């Protein structure tokens, strides 16, 4: 609904407006044309406004009664007065605070039905059918909901505040007369001057009167004398020394006189009984087997391996055993001392890890086999290189590739070139060379007489080292003999 302009309002109450909306043409919308003339016309019209007429209208409206002023601006007579508006606002606030949402909904339904009746009855009336009160009543549930949400937000904000602990949680050291309990007279069994127990305290040992070296000598002497009387201990003597409380107590009672303390220990029954608990060799072996099987579970060790001893004696023996040479031997055999419960973050199955460690240990202990070299492959390759070089003279082959292949076949059938030959005056002798070939099979053919004569020139060299190394040392000599050999072979014309 367009509001009427104040400058065009007539006193009679009719409202008319000379303003009209500017509707751009299609060309303006397509080409985004901005008509500056319209802007200039609007500025000119604004400049021609007479402010004196507006002031007169405002003065006239100030003198009008409220009913006429409402009718002037299009409102009916149903608008309540300011006093009534205040009362309605107070009622609305009370309704909102009470939180009666159901009643608010019913009132909204009734108001909407009343509005429908009013619209039907006042069809001829040009004034609108709704009033300020109706608008407030429609908006009222929203206001209540808004205030309720604000209340919830405030509660949430209170919950989100930083927690500040009270000072009561701080602990105080309760020392002093103010923290002492007041015991009634009839509950306490003892008086203030009366002792709780009858026996006096006895000093068992005082280390300030005797040097440590003298105490160690005294304990060694006491242990030696008792061992001579009762038998040697299964644990060998070492740098360790066992604290004998009974012997130290006897030394205190004798005013730290070592000779008198040793004499009393010899006739003391209690000390003799204590020394009777010497572990035998069988008990030590059973204890070590139990420690290997059950670990440090001394209850299982005592129940299954060392039944003649108590759990306390097993624990005491364990700490003595760890200081002895017997423990060093046991640790070397089983690596018990090195297993310090190592943590492995990436390992979940410790049994697989144990198997891997055992396999690696066995593989490291196994001797590695010596490297084997294939002499046959090297000798065959050297033989082929030698024959290829012997069949060429000045870079040109004598009889072509056919002669080379024939020579290789005859060489394989007739003689082993890598084996040294031994010279002999008797060609029919049954002596064999180092490779197991008979001389009579090799020297019968007249074609191989030159090679045998060539190799017989230096029998000492051939016997001392193999022909392979001789080829590398003197390639000139071998190449000469082999070339003569190839010439004799190819001269017969055999292919």
From Swiss-Prot:
GO terms for cellular component: nucleoplasm; transcription repressor complex
Keyword Repressor listed: yes
Transmembrane segments: none
Keywords: DNA-binding, Nucleus, Repressor, Transcription, Transcription regulation
GO MF annotations, alphabetized: DNA binding; histone deacetylase binding; transcription corepressor activity
Location(s) in or outside the cell: Nucleus
Region span, Disordered: 1-25, 76-131, 356-397, 416-495
UniProt entry tagged with the keyword Transmembrane helix: no
Acidic residues: compositionally biased ranges: 83-94
Domain called ELM2: residue spans: 171-269
GO annotation, biological process: chromatin remodeling; negative regulation of transcription by RNA polymerase II; regulation of DNA-templated transcription
Domain of life: Eukaryota
InterPro entries (alphabetical): ELM2_dom (IPR000949), Homeodomain-like_sf (IPR009057), MIER/MTA (IPR040138), MIER1/3_C (IPR045787), SANT/Myb (IPR001005), SANT_dom (IPR017884)
Residue ranges of every copy of the SANT domain listed in the record: 274-326
Function comment: Transcriptional repressor regulating the expression of a number of genes. Probably functions through recruitment of histone deacetylases involved in chromatin silencing.
Protein name in UniProt: Mesoderm induction early response protein 1
